[in-house]
Amino acid sequence: MKYTIIPFLLLVALTCATARSIDGSEKEVQEIREETPSSNEDVPFSLSANEDEEARGRLQAFLAKMKEIAAQTLGREESLSANEDEEARGRMQEFIKKLKAYLRKMKEKFSQISGREESFSANEDEEERGRLQAFLAKMKAIAAQTLGREESISANEDEETRGRLQAFLAKMKEIAAQTLGREESLSAIEDEEARGRLQAFLAKMKEIAAQTLGREESLSANEDEEARGRLQAFLAKTKEIAAQTLGREESLSANEDEEARGRLQAFLAKMKEIAAQTLGR
């Protein structure tokens, strides 16, 4: 009997100790729950002064980096030093040169195609010419605004411009020879119509030459007379070639004429699209 009571007392003591331990654990859990808000409750987020200052600093650094990237993308700093300003001007002049070269290529293609058969009405032809002139005027205005100055060309630049004019006239002569270098057999009415188109073509070439140079020619009396003489000689030579060529056989089939007209319309549509994209319309 004595040995039976001892284990019983030990069991009771163990049970009491376990109960106390469980009660203590429950109290600790309750305290933790009281200190920790529920996940379903909205907890306001408030930064300390140091954390707020750190976040503000990171934001300012981010904005400064964005400003730097924007300046690099635009190709200039907001306030340029002398060297940086010169570099930006050089990049702009290079862009203008590329733009002029692109326009010259477009004009050459237009000149080559305009030498073929056309069946545009007077209104459509005038409308296309007006759009082209407006586009060229817009390009000239953009170039003038971008450079921000009137062109004052030195002797070397003037010589370079004169060389470009001579190359342009040589190219026009080559195009005229290639265009007119085919057999023609025109009636009196068709011959008059072709002569009218040729005169319009020569007038257009003269206009394009003036627009290509992008400025009024201010040559000395001798240079002006020399340039005028070369232009008159070119026109006389072109008329002579035209007269010789118009006296020969030409027989284009209806399909070839339709094909040429289709290519011309496609080219004009492409020019209209490029002009619309450039002008931002």
Swiss-Prot record:
Reported tissue expression: Expressed by the venom gland.
Modified residues (Serine amide): S114
Recorded coiled-coil stretches: none
Signal peptide, first to last residue: 1-19
Subcellular location, record wording: Secreted
Residues recorded with modification Leucine amide: L74, L147, L180, L213, L246, L279
Transmembrane among keywords: no
Temperature dependence: Retains its effectiveness even after exposure to 100 degrees Celsius.
Protein name: LC-AMP precursor 3
Provenance organism: Lycosa coelestis
Organism taxonomic ancestry: Eukaryota, Metazoa, Ecdysozoa, Arthropoda, Chelicerata
